[in-house]
Structures are given as structure tokens and as C-alpha cells.
Amino acid sequence: MKKLVAQSVIDAFFDGTHSDPFAVLGMHETHNGIEIRVLLPEAHRVIVIDKETHKAVVELELVDERGFFNAIVPKANQFFAYELQVYWGKESQILEDPYRFHPMINELDNWLLAEGSHLRPYEVLGAHFVEYDNVAGVNFRVWAPNAKRVSVVGDFNYWDGRRHPMRFHPASGIWELFLPKVALGQLYKFELIDSNNQLRLKADPYAFAAQLRPDTASQVSALPEIVEMTEKRRAANQSDKPISIYEVHLGSWRRNLENNFWLDYDEIADELIPYVKEMGFTHIELLPISEYPFDGSWGYQPLGLYAPTSRFGTPDGFKRLIEKAHESGINVILDWVPGHFPSDTHGLAAFDGTSLYEYADPKEGYHQDWNTLIYNYGRHEVKNYLSGNALYWVERFGLDGLRVDAVASMIYRDYSRRDGEWVPNQYGGRENLEAIEFLKHTNYVLGTELPGVAAIAEESTSFPGVTLPPEHGGLGFHYKWNMGWMNDTLEYMKLDPVYRQYHHGKMTFAMLYQYSENFVLPLSHDEVVHGKGSLITKMSGDTWQKFANLRAYYGYMWAFPGKKLLFMGNEFAQGREWNYQESLDWFLLDDGQGGGWHSGVQRLVKDLNKTYQNQTALFELDTNPQGFEWLVVDDNQNSVFAFERRSKSGEVIIVVSNFTPVPRDNYRIGVNEPGKYEEILNTDSAYYKGSNLGNYGEVIAEEIENHGKAQSISVMVPPLATVYLRLKK
């Protein structure tokens, strides 16, 4: 038995500490001739087969009983393609030797990844099906620059880290290994010996599929095909188009009635898409679906950033859901969470023994509110990981927009921190300059590669220029959630109407900054959780008043400048607070159980969406001051508001809201134009379970001066109601 490799080297393989397997294993030219070395723990015999002649060339010698084989190939003077016939006791199988293949990452990809400027890093890193030298398999790559050894482990090698150590590329910090015959759906992880000599088992940060919790392995899955953006979908995102967003948590919109289990992506699509279409929403916004370990995070603490959650099926199933939405003319927005990640040991935390993805200093890298870690946006590879992820979801699944979660927590270093708990930037300021640059870069990439995709910011401060283009010094988002409008108006609606006169400005203040950004008016999931109650329970008064208040509020919201967002269940005034573990209370739409109140609100929201889409005055000039004018802004005594909305072509709608339970008959409002004003929507209609007061179809302008206008109209403003009056041309 001739040992051609030093025993210390062999021992290092079986100890799992050898960091350069390709320097030893596979086929090598030596002064003795062509030599083949194989590491196959627990194998008994290994015969080398010439792939061209299919003949046995040499039987390798077992030089270490733990499973290390080598031999000089007789009469061979050049490398050749081979496979191995391996005997495990009496059984044998034909195997490819992963260590006979050359490096597969090309120099350009390696350089771009090292620089952190690869536009689509997910096309290189992770697990990819490839064919090399007529051999099909999966190429695994992972970034772990400070690891001392990395192996691929999975159900194809008994999760044994000794069997498949990877090749290291020092210039980029990437480890690589091509494994023949690995199949779709097989489970895998990366086993690392980290910088501190600790053994770590990590899921693939770039995995396209992952196991459902509590299991944590990545799953081999094909890179989804590119979905081309269409002009119709692109146009639907523009600021001069009607955008009415239905926000959905897939795990609780509907559930299986028999066992309370989740529906899968296809079952959800079959029910959700027709419903959204029928209700008249233009967009669906999905709470995060990147794989996440904790159900109670609702997806806002993701670990598998490239993997659609397996709670509801496969990546293909998710893609079909989006396709069905597009077939029905509905755009899809995804909640995206690039701000932080959980500290689960199988995830990104201390990935290679160092703070690789997160800031090292807890004053920068630990989020005490959520017990999560904050991405190190100053590290080019991390920025590349996240920006690439944004492009991946939009390009590979056909999403029409991304809503970026918790932007304020990203751009401020002192977010939710006291003095002494945060680290200033290089200029001594509180802004996270790296995060700001990351957001600008990501929005620039999306805008350049996929023009028309909507980028929406949930940004809760007055940070300037959120929706300005990056080239003009802005963050580059297309829309920003108007959290100020939401907070102010909900505070107003909670008040007894008697006290609303003292808080009149809460309903009007948003107009002072309306044109500083492009806004979305959000009534989101955040307002119906954590003890806040449902929207209907926030309204003041008895049952009649609560529902009338909500209807009036919706009417006001749909006419106010800004795109609309409504969380699921709010469209029918769900009575209880949202519970992510249960279906919405759809039974309330049965008038026998809901008293007709809930179905009335649902009919109103449907009609609001229809009216909104059909009346250009309500959306075309959302971002232009010419599209809005207060007609009555100071009548705090009666808690009445009136304003005019106008389109590019001069179409006019007068909106009047009364937020007291007292009808305002013959209420005079000055208008800009004479003519007949048709009542096109009244939230007090009996159709919506209102008291059915109104204006008999229309009102006519008279030459009676009011509020500085030569013309005026006399309106019956129902109690706790909003009325839309359209000027007949």
C-alpha cells in the first residue's frame, strides 16, 4: 500500500479542517505520472472508469481505512474524463468525482462579486443547475471570506462535512463546488469552520427555496425564469393613475375551514384574485413572503431573503399567483425587508465567525426593539446582496413594486436609541449615510433595469426627498406612506363628535405638506394589531355612529389627494383585531350575523374604488396643487369640510364631509363653476346601511356669493357622511 499523500494531510480531511481540497483531491500530474486521489468515507473499493472507453483504468489503493484512496494511472500521460465505481460492502454505484472539475466561476463574476457591484449576484451565488463536461449537477457557491473550511452538506452526502469540502477563491471570499447528480428538491446547508475554529451549520443566504420552520435547511430549486414587464402594468403604477391597494397577509386572509390550516398559493389565487377584482382594487400588496422562522413576525423578520415561504407551497406556486393577478389586470406589490434580520443560528448572524452581514458594534448592528441584527450597508457585498434581492423579486417573479419596510430605522443611527446608545456617522450626524446610499442605489438599479416598477417607502419621519430621484439628491422612491395623515385622521375619528371642533386641523394638516412627496394614504395592518383594535372599534359612538363614521372617513380618504391602501378586513369593517393565526371574520358579511352593517361597508368600498377609477379628477393630479382646492376648511363649529378635486382636462368633483351626527341641510358652499352638480356617491345611502339623506340626485349652482366665490351650491350634508358631487359638463 503506497501512500502518495502525507498522513497529516489525510488526517486534516477526516478532521474536517483541510481548506484546499482541490490541491489534493482529483487528478494531478506528479513526477510519478498522472495520479488520482479520492476521499470517500466508509467506501471499501474504488475503480476508475474511463468515460470515453467505459473501461476500468485502475483500482485505487485504500491508503487510509477511513476512506482515502489514491493510485498512479498506468500509461496515462494526460488528463482524461473519468468516473468512479465505488463499492460499499457488496453494493456498488457509479459516481462522478466533484474534484475532477475545474473552477466554474468566471473571472468577471468573481471580480464583480469581490467589488460588490454585481447587478445580479443571485445568478452566481447559491445553488444553480448546470451541465459541465456533459455532466449535470448543481454548482454551490457561498460568500464566507473568513471561514477556514466550508463544505456542502445535505441528504445527498449524509450531512457529512468531510465528504464535500469546497474550493476557496481568496480574491472574492467565495467558496465553490460542483456536485454532479444533485437533484431538484434536495436539502442542503453549508458547514463552516469559522474564524474562531467553531463548527457552524448555515442555510444558504441565496437559496431559492427553504424548509418550513422548525426545519431550517435550504432546498435545491431552479432560478425562476425572467418575467417581462408590460406597458400596461408599468402604466398602472404611474402617479396620474388610480392606485387602490389591498394589503394582504396570505396566512390569514382565508384559511381551511375544517382544520384552520393555510391555503396554498394556488388556492389563495383562486379565491383572492377574483375577490380583489370584484372589489375594484387595482393593486395587491403582500406582507413579506421571504422565508422566515417565526410566524408571529408576519414575515417582517426574514432569513431566506431569496426564497418564497414554503408555508403556502413552492416558488412556482407563488409565481402562478402573481400571473393570475396580472391576467385579471391587478398589479402586485411585495413588502420587502432590507432593514434587519433575526439572529437565528442557521441564518446570517456571525456567518463565518465574524460580523459578516451585520455591523460589528451592537450600537450600530443590534435593533433592541425587535431583537434583530442590522445589515452593514457600508459593506459592498452586503449592499450587493440586498440590491440584488430587490431586482430578483421584480425580475424573476414579475412583481410590480416593492414597499420597503421601516425606512426610518435604516436611515437614522439613533432610531429608537437613547443618548450613548448609538454611533454618529463620520460627520458626527445621526443619519446612516451607508443606508441612504444603499436605498438610492437600489432604487436607481430598479429604475434603470425595470422602468415603471414602483418603489414605496414606509418612512415615518419628515426626512426630505424620499420620493425625489437620486440624481436630484433624493432617495429615489416613487411613493411614501403618509403616516402623518393616517395618525392625525385616526386620532380625529376616535373623538366624540362634540370634541372634534377643537381638533379640526387634524383633518386638514396633511395638505400643508401634501406636495412635498408623492403619498400613499395607508390604513395598514399596523393599525389593527397590538391592542389597537380594529378600525371600526376606533370609531366613536354607538353601532350606527361607528359604521357611519367609518363610511364617512373612507369617503373622505378616497377623495383626498394620495393613492389608497387598505388592509384586508377593513373593507368590510372587521369587528375584532387582526389575528395572524386565524381567517378574517367573513361570516360578518352574512346579514343574519352582521346585521347588514358589514356588507354595507363592503359595498361602499367597492363603489368607492369604482368611482375612484372612473373619475379622473380623483387621481390625475394627486401630486399637483392644481388638482385640489379647499372650499370649506374653517367650519370647525359644524365639523364640515369641503374641497374640489380637478382633473387635467378640467373635470370637477366637489367633496363634502360632515363629521357630526347632525344633518346639515341647505349647507351653502362656494364653487368655481356654474352648472349642475350630480351626486355620484353618498356614504349615507341606505344601500350602505345609512339613513338615506341626500340631494335627490343633483344640486344646481346659484349666483349667490359664498367663501369668496361668485357661485355657490346648497347641499344637504347627511350626518356622519361624505358626499361626492360631480360637475356635469
From Swiss-Prot:
Q: What is its EC number?
A: 2.4.1.18
Which SMART domains does the record match to this protein?
Aamy (SM00642)
A Pfam family cross-referenced in the UniProt record is CBM_48
Q: Name one GO molecular function term.
A: cation binding
Instruction: Give the reaction(s) catalysed.
Output: Transfers a segment of a (1->4)-alpha-D-glucan chain to a primary hydroxy group in a similar glucan chain
Q: From its record, what is one biological process in GO terms?
A: glycogen biosynthetic process
Mind telling me which Gene3D superfamilies this protein's record contains?
Glycosidases (3.20.20.80), Golgi alpha-mannosidase II (2.60.40.1180), Immunoglobulins (2.60.40.10)
Active-site residues (renumbered): 405 (nucleophile), 458 (proton donor)
Instruction: Write out the coiled-coil annotation as residue ranges.
Output: none
The record's annotation in InterPro entries points to: A-amylase/branching_C, Branching_enzy, GlgB, GlgB_N, GlgB_N_E_set_prok, Glyco_hydro_13_cat_dom, Glyco_hydro_13_N, Glyco_hydro_b
Q: In which pathway does it act?
A: Glycan biosynthesis; glycogen biosynthesis
Q: Which GO terms describe its cellular component?
A: cytosol
**What highest taxon heads this organism's lineage?**
Bacteria
What CDD domains does this protein map onto?
AmyAc_Glg_BE (cd11322), E_set_GBE_prok_N (cd02855)
Keyword annotations for this protein, in alphabetical order, are:
Carbohydrate metabolism, Glycogen biosynthesis, Glycogen metabolism, Glycosyltransferase, Transferase
Free-text function comment from the UniProt entry: Catalyzes the formation of the alpha-1,6-glucosidic linkages in glycogen by scission of a 1,4-alpha-linked oligosaccharide from growing alpha-1,4-glucan chains and the subsequent attachment of the oligosaccharide to the alpha-1,6 position.
Its quaternary organisation is: Monomer.
UniProt xrefs under HAMAP family: GlgB
Please give the family membership noted in the entry.
Answer: Belongs to the glycosyl hydrolase 13 family. GlgB subfamily.
**Protein name in the entry:** 1,4-alpha-glucan branching enzyme GlgB
